[in-house]
Amino acid sequence: MTSLQQQRVKYGPPHHIKRRPYHPILESLEFQTNQHLIQEYSLDIVNTLSQLESLTLVNPAMIDLQPEIQWFMRPFLLDFLIELHSSFKLQPTTLFLCLNIIDRYCAKRIVFKRHYQLVGCTALWIASKYEDKKSRVPTLKELTIMCRNAYDEEMFVQMEMHILSTLDWSIGHPTLEDCLQLAIDSNNLSNNTTNDIENKSVRPNRKSSISSAVTAVARFLCELSLYDKYFLSVPPSLIAITANLLSCSMLQIPHASITLKNLIEQEIINPQQKKQKKALSSNSSRTTTASYTHQNQSDVRHSSFDEDIDLDSGDEEDDDEDYIDEFYETNNYDDTNATTFDESISKSTTVNDENQPPQIHTPFLSGLDEDSILSIKKICLMLIIQLSKVTEVLSKKYENLGVIQVINNFHSNYKFIIQSIYENQELLLNTINDSTNNNEIDYKLIQSSEILLQFPKFDEYLTEDEDENVSTDDEANSQPQGYDGSGSDGNNQLFTPKSPNAFSSNSSLTLNNHPQSMVPVTPPSATSQYSLFSNKNNRTHESTSGLNSTCNTPTHISISSFAPPQPPPGSILKPKLTSINSTNSLKIKKLTSNSNSSNINIHHGHHNTKQEKRYSHISIGSNSSSKYDGFSPIKSISTNGSLITNNGSLITNNGSFTNIVNNTNSSSPLMNQQQQQQVTQSSLYQHHHQYHQ
C-alpha cells in the first residue's frame, strides 16, 4: 500500500528526461541550406561587419584610468567566464561578444573591484541572449549560485539595464569567431593541392576534418588573445587572419598562405605595376613633347626680322590691345614648357581617393594595405609571447582536442626562432607600446614572424630599367620603416626579405615535451569561494596565491614547451668538460714565462681568489649580461671544427678552452707588466710559426 501511495503522489511533468540527440544528417542539411541563403547577402553582411568593426573598437587607454580595476585582474575574470561558458555549453561567439561588452562598458563607466565579477556575469547573460538559443541561456538563479551568492538576482537585472543604456542598446560586434569563419572560408580547403586522385565521397570528410582542425587551433589562439591588453587596440579581423595563418602553419597546411599570396598580388602588386607603367608612359610623352616645343621655339627665334615688326602699329593700337586681352583670356598660357598636366582631373581623383572608404576584401574588414600586413606580423609575435602565459583553464579546455600537442610540436620544430623572440621580448613590447616608434621593429623579428606564419614569397616585379626611370621618393616615404627592407638604397621592393620555402621542411608532428622548462605562474580560478571579486575576499588583504580553491581546475599550466626558455643541461653552448676527471671547482693556472702558447689549462682544486680576480675578464660559457644564458639561435662557426662562443673563447674538439689572442686586452689593469710581455711573446710566436708553415 505504501508503495502504491508513493507512486500516486508524483504529479506534474516528468523529471530527468534524456534529450534525444539531433540527427547529424538533419544538422548537415540545415547547415547547407543556411549557407546557400547567406550567400545571397554576403556582400551586405561583410559591409555591415566592417562598419561595426570601426564603431565597436575599444580604447585600452580609457580602461587604464579605472581607479580600482587593474590589468592583472583580467585573467581571473576571464578564467571564470570560460568555465561558465563551457559549463553552459554556449556558442563560441558568445564568449567573444561577452568580452567586448565588458571592455566597452569599462571604457565608459567606472567599475569597482567588488562589482567586476557582476559585470562579467551580466555581460555573459546578455551575450547568451543575443547569440544562443533560449534553452541554453543561464537563469538568474544559476548565476547567483555560480557567484557564491555574492550578488542578488535584482543586482543582475539592474546591471543589465545599466550596461545596455551605456552601450546605447547596440550590442552587435564582429567577434573573433565571425572574422575567423570568414578567414577559414577564404582558404578554399576544397581545392585539392596533392596529385592523388580521391573519391568524391571522401573529399567532403577530408575537407571537414581539415577545417575542424584549423578552426580548433585558431580558436585557441583567438581566446588566448583575450588575455592581453595589446589585442584590444587591433581590429579583430586582423587577429583572426593571423590566427588562421598561424594555425595552418602549425598543421602544415598551405591553403592560407596561397590565398594570401593571390590576394596581395591582385590588390597590391598589380595596381602598383599599372601605376608604374603609367608613370613611365607619361614620362616618355613629356620628354617627346618637350623636344617638339623646343624645336618650335627655335624656329620662332630664327624667323626673319621683318615678320616680327608690326607695320600698322600707329593706326590700330587699340585694336591690337583688345586682341591681346582677348587672346590671354581665352588661352591661358602656361610657361612650363608643356610639362604640366590637367590639375582639375588630378584634384578630382585625389579627392575621391581620400573620401572613399578602404576597399573591403572578404577576410580583411578594415582594408588590405601594407600597414595591415605589417600589423599581422606584429600580432604573430605577440601571440608567440602570449603562448608562454597560457592558463590552466584554457589548456584544459583544448587538451582533449589535441591542440596542446600541435602547439608542442610547433615549438619543437621552430625552437630556436621562438627562443630568439623570447630573448627580444622586452624590446618588442617597448616598441609596440610606444606610439612614436610603432613601425620601427627589428628586422630579424619581422623575418622570424614570416617564417612562423609561412608567409608567401614574392618575386621582384620591377626591372632595373624601371627602377632607374621611376622616382620612388613618395612611395618610400609612405612605406613603414623596418618593413620593406629597402634601407637607404630606395629600391621599390614591396615586402620583407624572402623567407625560406615554408613547405620544404620534413618535420613530423611528434610530441616533444621539455621537462627543463619553467612552468609559468598563472592566476587561480575565479570560481574560488574566496574570489578576488567577491565581497568576502575584500575583508582581508591576503595574497590570492595562498588561498584554496574549491573548483576542480588546477591553478597552474601543464604546457612546458612554451615556457620561457631555459638552457638544457646538455646544451652545446654550455659544453661539458669530458677530459677532466675531478669534480671540484675550477682553478686557472698562472701563465709562466716558458709557455709558448696562449692556452689556458683548466684544472680542478680549491678556489683561489687572487686568480679569479686577475682573470675575471675571461668568461667561460655565454655572456653574463644575456637574459637566457647559453642560448643563442645563431651558432658561431670555426673552420677547424671548433666552436666559438659569444665572448670570444674557443672550444676545441678535446674539450679544452683557449682564449683568442686578438681579443685579449693587454692594456687591462688586471694584468701586470710580466703577463703583458708573455701575451705579446706568445702572439709573436704564433705568427712566426704560421709564417714558416
From Swiss-Prot:
Family, per entry: Belongs to the cyclin family.
Comp. bias (Polar residues): 273-298, 489-516, 524-563
**SUPFAM superfamilies to which the protein is assigned, alphabetical:** Cyclin-like
GO BP term, pick one? filamentous growth
What is the protein's name according to its record? G1/S-specific cyclin CCN1
- Gene Ontology cellular-component annotations: cyclin-dependent protein kinase holoenzyme complex; cytoplasm; nucleus
UniProt key word Cell cycle: yes
Compositional bias (Low complexity) spans? 666-685
Q: Does the keyword Glycoprotein apply?
A: no
What induces or represses its expression, per the UniProt entry?
Answer: Expression peaks at G1/S. CCN1 is stabilized during germ tube formation.
What are the protein's GO molecular function terms? cyclin-dependent protein serine/threonine kinase regulator activity; protein kinase activity
User: What is the species of this protein?
Assistant: Candida albicans (strain SC5314 / ATCC MYA-2876)
Keywords (A to Z) from UniProt: Cell cycle, Cell division, Cyclin, Mitosis
